[in-house]
Amino acid sequence: MSGASSSEQNNNSYETKTPNLRMSEKKCSWASYMTNSPTLIVMIGLPARGKTYVSKKLTRYLNWIGVPTKVFNLGVYRREAVKSYKSYDFFRHDNEEAMKIRKQCALVALEDVKAYLTEENGQIAVFDATNTTRERRDMILNFAEQNSFKVFFVESVCDDPDVIAANILEVKVSSPDYPERNRENVMEDFLKRIECYKVTYRPLDPDNYDKDLSFIKVINVGQRFLVNRVQDYIQSKIVYYLMNIHVQPRTIYLCRHGESEFNLLGKIGGDSGLSVRGKQFAQALRKFLEEQEITDLKVWTSQLKRTIQTAESLGVPYEQWKILNEIDAGVCEEMTYAEIEKRYPEEFALRDQEKYLYRYPGGESYQDLVQRLEPVIMELERQGNVLVISHQAVMRCLLAYFLDKGADELPYLRCPLHTIFKLTPVAYGCKVETIKLNVEAVNTHRDKPTNNFPKNQTPVRMRRNSFTPLSSSNTIRRPRNYSVGSRPLKPLSPLRAQDMQEGAD
């Protein structure tokens, strides 16, 4: 462990008693935001084409990588305006009264979009509606131009009757539009609703009318894509993400390595091997997988000894990913929490104050880890059945993506040793099963502290990382108050909680 040099201490007279662990850090080149102006993502497509599925999944991904994003589903606004849905007649293009109501709902939703992007620190809004007419899309473009929003269209095109029928039965039967209705009646009414939309549907025209717009067409659930005039970095990320996801049934298994020697000693980080109980877990994991009879299962590990030893016992091929390595604790590697608190009391307190943003001196933060793990998420979205054997912090980040957890919850998600999380993607989320393999292990979980700072203790300076925090419904924007080589500003007060949907329109 090395502290700051004497010259560094002399240059920082306000901190002469404690080594400055952070002066050697380089500034990160990432900007504070990933967008240079607010973006409105506009869904397009007939009902039962997966628009809400894409909207929710894309929003979950963007929030996870740190771009505050929110879905505005027009069906929710319509159901607020019209409390009882009677039949497909409401969606006929010659139903003038209904057309007025639907247009008014769209205008109200767009006003909420404006408030979110201009007043609530939002960066991306997803307008989840059919938007099948050129008139509607032109109205949205005019709205965006007036408010200086970028627009990116996502059109979902599907002509496979089996996919459409499956979507109706899986999602629409449970829609608020159809309380207490049987499947046959729902299918009949919804197919007639689709026919109503087909009368006025004008797909995006990349060769003429819409050639200057930015958009992606997703054809038959990802069989083909058409991309047109991508404007910026965030739009390219959206395109890349949409080209990697699929809807085929699969299961993702997440677990930590077996208990390690350092786990027994209470030490963090390092590269120790498995304990006796850790090896027992590896054998129990092998038996579990054999009983499951999982087809074409891929196994991924980190490059650390404890995950590799766990995978070796399975008797199957596995792939090692360096980016699955545990969070880098920097100068605190191979120390216990008690040792960290004694040797670096301010660092210990700072991490308790804001665990997601806190970066170990010479190491990583959870925020850094999310960025590092993005390729893993992309690859998981492309794959079928996968078992990921990783580490506590890594598993928390992966779980936060699949379970749509925010920055406040992520660092405190419970990921006990010798426990498997079975994740099964469903229509608008992810089903989770927790399976304990009945092999004892130490508890490595630390609960969130209730009081970060005693009243008689000087609050520790908050240190913001260089790019946007993982977004959540309680998005908090705090100014940077410490840069390398400059005197910190006055300490921040403890963070307080901020007060901060689906279907066809």
From Swiss-Prot:
Polar residues bias spans: 450-476
InterPro entries documented for this protein: 6Pfruct_kin, 6Phosfructo_kin, His_Pase_superF_clade-1, His_PPase_superfam, P-loop_NTPase, PG/BPGM_mutase_AS
Binding-site residues for ATP, renumbered to this chain: 45-53, 167-172, 348-351, 392-396, 428
One MF term in the entry's GO annotations: fructose-2,6-bisphosphate 2-phosphatase activity
Activity regulation details: Phosphorylation results in the activation of the kinase activity.
Swiss-Prot/TrEMBL GO biological process terms: fructose 2,6-bisphosphate metabolic process; fructose metabolic process; glucose catabolic process; glycolytic process; lactate metabolic process; positive regulation of insulin secretion; response to glucose
Region feature Fructose-2,6-bisphosphatase, mapped onto this chain: 249-505
PROSITE patterns per record: PG_MUTASE
PTM section of the record: Phosphorylation by AMPK stimulates activity.
Superkingdom in the source lineage: Eukaryota
Binding-site list for beta-D-fructose 6-phosphate: R78, R102, T130, R136, K172, R193, Y197
Sites where the protein binds beta-D-fructose 2,6-bisphosphate: R256, N263, G269, Y337, R351, K355, Y366, Q392, R396
Site label Transition state stabilizer, positions: R256, N263, H391
Region described as 6-phosphofructo-2-kinase: spans on this chain: 2-248
N-acetylserine carried by residues: S2
Catalytic-site annotation from UniProt: D128, C158, H257 (tele-phosphohistidine intermediate), E326 (proton donor/acceptor)
Residue numbers spanned by region Disordered: 1-20, 445-505
Known EC number: 2.7.1.105, 3.1.3.46
Tissue-wise expression: Heart.
Positions bearing Phosphothreonine: T468, T475
Subunit details: Homodimer. Forms a heterodimer with PFKFB3.
Function: Synthesis and degradation of fructose 2,6-bisphosphate.
Name of the protein in question: 6-phosphofructo-2-kinase/fructose-2,6-bisphosphatase 2
Originating species: Homo sapiens
GN (gene name): PFKFB2
